[in-house]
Amino acid sequence: MNIAIIYGGKSSEHEVSLQSASSIIRTIDKKHKLHLIGISKNGAWYLHGDEERERIIKNEKAVLKIKKDEAKRVTVIPGGGAKKGLKAGDEFLPTDAVFAVLHGRFGEDGTIQGLFEMADLPYVGGDVMSTSISMDKEKTKMIWDYSGLPIVPYIAIKRQDWDDPEKKKAILARAEKDLEYPLFIKPCRAGSSVGAGMVKNRNELLEQAEESFLWDNKILVEACIEAREVECSVTGNTKTVAYIPGEIIPTHKFYDYEAKYTDPNGAELKIPADLNETQRKTIRETAIKAYEALDLSGLSRVDFFIDKRTGKIYLNEVNTIPGFTAISMFPKMCGASGLPYNELIMHLIELAIDRFKTDRKLKTCRQS
């Protein structure tokens, strides 16, 4: 099989993507041909040769690098002809499936998914609509709330409203009245907790809101509950499977970017999570409902809060391309349920091809 692995990207999670893709490359059987395509931080795509794959395989601590070789610039060819998909320089890259290991913006927001649709290529993960909605935390919460699923109280703020003095005054009054301090503020369309923070008073709220607005033009203000953080891996197209939940116990104030990726002691990961049977069942069932409410396919990691005081379970958010690093929860939870890393990766690729075949049966135009 010819598999394109795409990594890097124009995202705050560029470095995380390099780590995730490195782990995936190590686990794919060498009988499969890999096209390693690195996207620079300014958005240029470059093909990397087999020597990069060998370097990653031989050293478990090695991380992918992106070499800017203009002779290896990758272009995407729209479908409709005999040769479609991906091309590096003058070299056509036969591709059976694409695994875009891109976290955050331009990876989980429907943009690259639309590109693959136009190129007529099977790709891992949700489609354009489901990923774009799931990237927007406000829209995700609206759909979950409409579906009767439990969410933490919140308000969403747009940049233009925040910049209007009268609207800003009303927003602050509403946040303090309806939600009360402490509050948690984060960009609506960013990942890995970048631009996010907890605030205990108005001055901190004003400061944190400006930080969050650096990452998106819409931010979320949530009630901050003292909670356990539990996650659940989900895979599937028409048949959805939720795996054994895991728990994150941060040593930081909250599970921020440093705790996730740069501080080896940033959090304790417990798989399985210390839950009773009722809680475990509720989380797995709710994860499936949350996934299906968003019309997701392929894979996602669904994140939960469990209120330490009341025991109530809330949905937090969903990640349509979760981390695949050596310490990432998604593959570990699948592994704890009996699906080892190498089989998981091939399962996701098979799901991508299956969905592609199903979608190709649909009519796209009237026959003349």
UniProtKB/Swiss-Prot annotation:
Pfam families: Dala_Dala_lig_C, Dala_Dala_lig_N. Mg(2+) 2 binds at E317, N319. One of its GO terms (molecular function) is D-alanine-D-alanine ligase activity. The keyword Zinc does not apply. The keyword ATP-binding applies. Its main location: cytoplasm. GO terms for biological process: cell wall organization; peptidoglycan biosynthetic process; regulation of cell shape. Keywords: ATP-binding, Cell shape, Cell wall biogenesis/degradation, Cytoplasm, Ligase, Magnesium, Manganese, Metal-binding, Nucleotide-binding, Peptidoglycan synthesis. It is an enzyme of class 6 (ligase). Its EC number is 6.3.2.4. It is found in: Cytoplasm. Binds 2 magnesium or manganese ions per subunit. Residues 141-350 form the ATP-grasp domain. InterPro entries: ATP-grasp, ATP_grasp_subdomain_1, D-Ala_lig_Van_CS, D_ala_D_ala, Dala_Dala_lig_C, Dala_Dala_lig_N, PreATP-grasp_dom_sf. It catalyses: 2 D-alanine + ATP = D-alanyl-D-alanine + ADP + phosphate + H(+). Pathway: Cell wall biogenesis; peptidoglycan biosynthesis. One of its GO terms (cellular component) is cytosol. Its cofactor is Mg(2+); Mn(2+). ATP binds at residues 176-231. Mg(2+) 1 binds at D303, E317. HAMAP family: Dala_Dala_lig. Cell wall formation. Belongs to the D-alanine--D-alanine ligase family. This is D-alanine--D-alanine ligase. The gene is ddl.
